[in-house]
């Protein structure tokens, strides 16, 4: 067993063999200066991961919140009747002719930063504000994507409202989650005969599968701030990955609840194809309208008909096409219990419906000038929101074979503001522009040809198809024959047609659930009832720590040599916990043991490193970065619980799990057999 040098340790120094030591690296190595000394107590061979039984928290009801980029909502089911999914009440407001049961992800705060409203209420109230007054209100929309794109996400990260004012992102998300919490609890109180006891609710939050650990932790922190759960009851909150939730839900569907694009288009010409898709969507809308009337959706107690046809080892892909991102995952069916195994780490990118909105904004910049659009958004924020709403309504009617042009209303304030800024009217601007597919109609509207509208879809749709094709080319996912298109953007006939045209000829069966926009929400409820359904996941990154190894000439680089007390060490060695793309079972643990470096030490901080490569040797290698810190809180010396063992020799056994939707850690003080408060912080960088 190794001893601890006098000098305190920095970073994480784990020893899995007698050839390793916790001696610190020399000055200049990329580590923090926090004193987090530990002595390794692991055996000579690195312990193999162990699986333990999952501890299920008791609950009476599951409430899932699908927090989307463009729209959000909640649903719930009782533990006594898990197959009955109760949808939220129909929201007040809404867009005429738009079949959508969720509410826009729009938050409105007063000029003082106090919560005013959310969803349709927020959007409509902001729309009705006087233009000058609206400049002082804080209106946030489509802000979920900011968390995904932030490279240095912390608890201090800020979001910018439409008027340019900034606010802590954590508070913005907490306002939104608190809104859903209060609505859901009120509805539960009205439906349940007995009052819900504290802790009776298991909450589920959906996030994209491609989100990294800091973004997932951020959502959990926002949930704590919103009061969904306390840190002491952290297990009452689950993070569900959106394509996984969709996959869980699709397992329950019957054939009449699915639209098979492959069979709809087989053997038909273009006209027959269009009629088939349009007809199927009318049927889907009617089915959805009827289900909304009752707001209770019953799923199969077992698996649906499509799943009943599948056999052990069958593979399928889920493409979650949402407002902000496309999320791809590939699952393999395991029998006899119908559990799922992830075959390749989640992939995707920023190819959501928002990309079409950005293309429309770029089109306006080409016509009216980038400087004017920027100024209009800044000085007339409410009118800009009106314009985006008008475009959204027309975007939903776009189709690959639509014959007629689409009219988009320009707010009067846009027309007036442009005339005052440029000295001529918008019709003149359109005539002078190089955009030939957009005209000015006699009704005072932008008249877009179908070609122009479809061009706005092209970059986003192409990005989605390219990602699917890249994933299908991976050796690990060979044999996939079924593709589920889910998410709000999957309602688009443009996207459906493009995916079927590109992939249908490869023998891939493309299937769309009728309630495609609610698939993730309903699946999140089912996931909350049985989170163990996804039994094996793939680690998206390689995780580990920095250690010192006995220096071996010819094997270790000379620049990594460190001599201390006459012993030669190799510094900055990357000790791997789990490798990128490694299969990790749910409940599987990676265990390490440590002891404090100093008597009386109350806290141990251990730096975690990650990279995309599987074969990184040193924490200084390109692509390896510090991504978080493991914190262990120790009992003070002299506590009755302490058996008298010297703190410097006290063993702390930590167990980390990489097979869940979040990386989790637990720790035990071996001398007392008491739990040690342990946490991993990914937001401190």
UniProtKB/Swiss-Prot annotation:
Domain of life: Eukaryota
GO terms for MF: ATP binding
Tissues showing expression: Expressed most strongly in heart with little or no expression in other tissues. In the aorta, preferentially expressed in lesions.
One Gene Ontology biological process: endothelial cell migration
Post-translational modification Phosphoserine, affected residues: 25, 29, 44, 46, 276
Disulfide bonds: none
Positions of region (Disordered): 1-50
SUPFAM superfamilies in alphabetical order: Actin-like ATPase domain
Residues with PTM Phosphothreonine: 42
Keywords linked to the UniProt accession: ATP-binding, Nucleotide-binding, Phosphoprotein
Sequence similarity: Belongs to the heat shock protein 70 family.
Name of the molecule in the record: Heat shock 70 kDa protein 12B
């Amino acid at each position: 067993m190794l001893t601890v040098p006098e000098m305190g340790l920095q970073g994480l120094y784990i020893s899995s063999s007698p050839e390793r030591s916790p001696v610190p690296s020399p000055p200049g190595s990329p580590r923090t200066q926090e004193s987090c000394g530990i002595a390794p107590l692991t055996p000579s061979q690195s312990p193999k991961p162990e699986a333990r039984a999952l501890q299920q928290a008791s609950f009476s009801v599951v409430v899932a919140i699908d927090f989307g980029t463009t729209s959000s909502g909640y649903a719930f089911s009782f533990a006594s009747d898990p197959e009955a999914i109760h949808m939220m009440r129909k929201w007040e407001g809404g867009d005429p002719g738009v079949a959508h049961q969720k509410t826009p992800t729009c938050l409105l705060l007063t000029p003082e930063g106090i919560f005013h409203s959310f969803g349709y209420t927020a959007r409509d109230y902001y729309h009705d504000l006087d233009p000058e007054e609206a400049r002082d209100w804080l209106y946030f929309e489509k802000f979920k994507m900011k968390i995904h794109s932030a490279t240095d996400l912390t608890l201090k990260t800020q979001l910018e409202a439409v008027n340019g004012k900034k606010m802590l992102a954590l508070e913005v998300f907490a306002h939104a989650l608190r809104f859903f919490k209060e609505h859901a609890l009120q509805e539960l109180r009205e439906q349940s005969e007995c009052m819900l006891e504290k802790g009776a609710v298991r909450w589920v939050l959906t996030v994209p599968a491609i989100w990294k650990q800091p973004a997932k932790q951020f959502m959990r922190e926002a949930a704590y701030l919103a009061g969904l759960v306390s840190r002491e009851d952290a297990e009452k909150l689950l993070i569900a990955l959106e394509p996984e939730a969709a996959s869980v839900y699709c397992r329950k569907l019957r054939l009449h609840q699915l639209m098979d694009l492959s069979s709809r288009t087989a053997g038909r010409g273009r006209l027959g194809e269009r009629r088939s898709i349009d007809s199927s969507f009318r049927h889907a809308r009617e089915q959805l309208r009827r289900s909304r009337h009752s707001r209770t959706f019953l799923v199969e107690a077992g698996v649906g008909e499509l799943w009943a046809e599948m056999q052990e080892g069958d593979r399928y892909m889920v493409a979650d096409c949402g407002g902000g991102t496309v999320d791809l995952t590939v699952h393999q069916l395991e029998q006899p219990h119908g559990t799922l195994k992830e075959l390749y780490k989640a992939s995707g990118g920023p190819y959501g419906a928002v990309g079409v909105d950005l293309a429309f904004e770029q089109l306006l910049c080409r016509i009216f000038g980038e400087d004017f659009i920027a100024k209009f958004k800044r000085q007339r924020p409410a009118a800009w929101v009106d314009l985006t709403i008008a475009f959204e309504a027309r975007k939903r009617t776009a189709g690959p074979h639509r014959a007629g042009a689409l009219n988009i209303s320009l707010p009067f304030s846009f027309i007036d503001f442009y005339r005052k800024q440029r000295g001529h009217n918008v019709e003149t601007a359109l005539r002078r522009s190089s955009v030939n597919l957009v005209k000015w109609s006699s009704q005072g509207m932008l008249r877009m040809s179908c070609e122009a509208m479809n061009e706005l879809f092209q970059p986003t749709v192409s990005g989605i198809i390219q990602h699917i094709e890249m994933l299908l080319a991976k050796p690990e996912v060979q044999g996939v024959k079924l593709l589920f298109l889910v998410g709000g953007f999957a309602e688009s006939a443009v996207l459906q047609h493009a995916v079927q045209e590109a992939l249908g000829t490869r023998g891939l069966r493309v299937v769309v659930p009728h309630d495609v926009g609610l698939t993730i929400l309903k699946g999140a409820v089912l996931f909350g009832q049985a989170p163990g359904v996804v039994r094996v996941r793939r680690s998206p990154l390689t995780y580990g720590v920095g250690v010192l190894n006995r220096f071996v000439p010819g094997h270790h680089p000379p620049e990594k040599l460190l001599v201390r007390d006459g012993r030669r060490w190799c510094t900055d060695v990357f000790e791997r916990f789990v490798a990128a793309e490694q299969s990790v079972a749910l409940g599987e643990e990676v265990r390490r043991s440590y002891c404090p470096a100093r008597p009386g030490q109350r806290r141990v901080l251990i730096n975690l490193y990650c990279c995309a490569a599987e074969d990184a040797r040193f924490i200084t290698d390109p692509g390896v970065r510090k991504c978080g810190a493991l914190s262990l809180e120790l009992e003070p010396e002299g506590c009755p619980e302490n058996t008298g063992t010297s703190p410097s020799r006290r063993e702390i056994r930590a167990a980390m799990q990489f097979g869940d939707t979040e990386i989790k850690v637990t720790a035990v003080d071996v001398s007392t057999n008491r739990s040690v408060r342990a946490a991993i912080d990914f937001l401190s960088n």
